[in-house]
Amino acid sequence: MTESERTESEAPAGWAAGPVREPRGRGRLFDAAVRAYLERHPEATVVALGEGLGTGFWRLDNGRLTWLTVVPPKTAAARRMLLPDGARRRTVARAVTDHAWLDAVPEPWRGVVVTAPGVLMRLPPPAVRALLVACAERFPGGVLVFDALPGRATALARRAAAAGGRWPAPRWGLDRAQLPRVACLHPGIVAVRELGPVPAVPGGAAAGGLWSRLVWRGRRVPVLRALTPLVCEVRFASATSPRAVPPGALRQR
């Protein structure tokens, strides 16, 4: 193993084992979706939007992928200091809404999986639509995985934020009944589905603990279903698919 390969595969120096442990709850759904995509496209690029100081690369690296972390410039400076770029991972200093980050994906034809945990709900609806359309046009055969709050939960979260709550108010929400509308945003979007249940923890332990199990089971109860968050995967048409549309085609109509 070369020095660069050793550095890539090992956890960041000075970090305890904790930061690279398996995530809980919804985080497992994101990891499972990435792993499933990498099984089909082992040399794909993983684009982690808003990852901050996350260490997903060390959890999911298969030795062949490329990893891009897209964060605002100030966050990017801190990440590069603590987690310097490597041969197959790089921090891109861009806001999610600055679509110049799409140009940083080196070889999209090898496959692209974009993850956006906690990201889309912080964007205004037009920015969410623009991001989905841009990815559909630029990443044929790729997928985007995101989470969202249903409309009722979004309204409650906004009230809590207005009352001085800890978390910022979400700007965009998505009900489960609205998933087909996402597929209609662009001809290059071929499927939108909710992911779940939360995958089991290796070794047979319950995934995500008691709270995650209760949340998942609560989806079967209509009242609770309207409040529980959802994790979704958007699939984009391959370049050879009859539904694939050249970049900018919709804007030219």
Language model segments and positions:
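Alpha-helical subdomain
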Residues: 1-45, 51-253
